[in-house]
Amino acid sequence: EIAQCLVGSEMCIRDRPVPYALAPAENFAMGGVALLTALGNVQEISFGSECGDIRLLSQAAEACRVCKTDYADVMDDFLRSGYSYPEVLSQMVGQLYGAETAAVLRHPNNTLAIAYLNAIHEMDSPLRPMTIQRRGAGHNSSQPGPDGTASATYIRQFFADGGDCRRMMPSYAWHALREAQQAGHVASMSYLERLILYKLRTTDPDELHDIAEIGQGLEHRLYKAKRSASLEELLQTIRTKRYPMARLRRILLHILLDIRTADIQNYPAYGRILAFNDTGREILKDSKEKRLLPFSHSLAELAHTSPTAGRCAALESQATDIYQLARPVIGQGESDFRRKITISGGTHHAAPESQS
């Protein structure tokens, strides 16, 4: 599947370490911006958005920064009253900057775009941002758009239900997905249900308190709900207005993988290269003397660069091992340290160990 990404015009594929890949928008974006900046020779970063207007997104990003710094106490008061964070932020931005700016915050791709812009600002990164407007179906749309495009949410569910979604994605992506399905490599969280329930039943509230994204007493709600007999029952028991379902699913994976708040608060300790083509090779070669972090395809090599890197590498390896249990056909453990890099270009092509 990684090789198919190179076919799809990706020049160099680097791995966002699992603590950041599973993190909320702010930390997810921070991880991406930090890694691109650390290469030392990347000038631009692009991301999707519903509005497609970098000026408006930049204004919304500034508004969010002002609200979080200058009006933090006011926000905390509203949050303690039971309002959700997006609601409070949108209301405050609207009052301070107007309805047009506040409206930007109501769309998920805009929210991630704002997180990228704020990460660039926080790090004083030289990256120049640009945005590509999302067209067709919305981010979480349950139906294809008028032009036939579909959201990833819809495609995943449609495919899981046995639907033929070849017209909803590039042909190379469809073939890769079909091959993975036929090999029993399409993962599902349903295969992790017993593991998650076991982990929750054997973790005390003090340990839960340190898990990423848990706060405001959620550890006690989780602990009380540990008797749940299914993930669905568990999620319905702990769900609140302040904790939407998407965040709760992330938190359950944080618990399973032992990803803690400290793991997502700092910048990534390394950059892992999964694949590259000829152009990507030149980018990596040019960056060699300019890098601010260690970059390598070898997780074992990266793990020894610092204690923080060792912790992150252990989390990555563990996540891959658990991922292998989330497939219809269980994969071998300890595969992450043996993964081979994929090189596409000319006649040289090295396939990675099979993994979806």
Predicted regions and their residues:
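Active-site cores that bind ATP or allylic diphosphates and position pyrophosphate for catalysis
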Residues: 17-356
